[in-house]
Design a protein with these regions (language model features):
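A cross-kingdom marker for long, charged
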Residues: 27-33, 203-239
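N-terminal Sec/ER secretory leader and immediately downstream segment
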Residues: 23-101
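Bacterial N-terminal signal peptides
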Residues: 6-15
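Positively charged n-region of N-terminal signal peptides that target proteins for export
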Residues: 1-4
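Mid-length scaffold segments of soluble, non-membrane domains
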Residues: 93-165
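Sec/Tat signal peptide C-region and signal peptidase I cleavage site
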Residues: 16-20
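An amphipathic alpha-helical core segment
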Residues: 161-207
Length: 239
């Protein structure tokens, strides 16, 4: 009899501990007054946050000047040419450099809308275990989830858009001209470089940067919670 009572007490205390741990996770995630919310509603709220953040980040990056006029994600000269940029500009190649940089950013802007479906698929695939990890993570935990689930697919999807736009804009010809000038400089090292790969990588970096900004806003700024579910799940801050 005593053993049965002890077992019941142990189970009861374990359930209290588990509940307290869940509440602490919700508090860390910036969720609102989550008491009374079911696990499925919390997961739905996180999925909704992902959807809103993903849609906003794709809109911001996939428009004209989405990359080019955003200094945080603007694609600059490749690393192998950047040290020589000042010298090349002094030699009169400024317009070519500017056209090259603009074309790289235009290619990224053309590719960005392809992320929407891939992000949507990743949201649909999210399990409650994934939601728990996001819940217990930091301000960009959802973005980190997207990175782990979509980076490979995004790279595959972005490459054709980048190659097509770069070809149409004559980027490879511009790049070849710049590298020839670079290689004509005494002691300059000639290195093989995949400019398409560079643009795809920088395009993804920019996309995830914007997604992280959107996630922070949803977690911390009530005005960014644009749906009733987001308002309910990410409601009043817990004290």
């Amino acid at each position: 009899m005593v053993r049965s009572i002890a077992l019941c007490i142990s189970i009861f205390l374990s359930s209290i501990t588990a509940h307290a741990q869940l509440e602490e996770l919700e508090k860390r995630a910036g969720l609102g007054n989550a008491s009374g919310l079911t696990d499925s509603k919390v997961a739905s709220g996180l999925k909704e946050a992902l959807r809103v953040g993903a849609e906003n980040s794709v809109k911001l990056t996939g428009k004209t000047d989405g990359y080019f006029k955003n200094e945080a994600i603007k694609i600059l000269m490749p690393g192998n040419l950047r040290p020589l940029e000042k010298g090349l500009r002094a030699m009169g190649f400024g317009p070519k450099i500017d056209a090259f940089i603009l074309s790289m950013n235009r290619s990224a802007e053309a590719a960005a809308p392809a992320a929407k479906k891939i992000f949507t698929d990743a949201i649909l695939e999210m399990s409650f275990a994934d939601a728990r990890k996001i819940l217990s993570g930091g301000d960009t935990a959802a973005t980190d989830y997207f990175k782990s689930k979509t980076s490979e697919r995004l790279t595959t999807a972005f490459r054709p858009f980048v190659e097509k736009t770069m070809s149409e804009n004559g980027v490879m010809k511009q790049y070849k001209g710049l590298t020839e000038q670079y290689q004509s400089i005494p002691f300059a090292k000639s290195e093989s470089f995949d400019v398409n790969k560079y643009v795809v990588e920088k395009a993804l970096d920019g996309l995830f940067h914007e997604l992280a900004e959107q996630e922070r806003e949803i977690r911390k700024n009530p005005a960014a919670r644009t749906t009733s579910l987001l308002k309910e799940v990410f409601g009043q801050s817990r004290k």
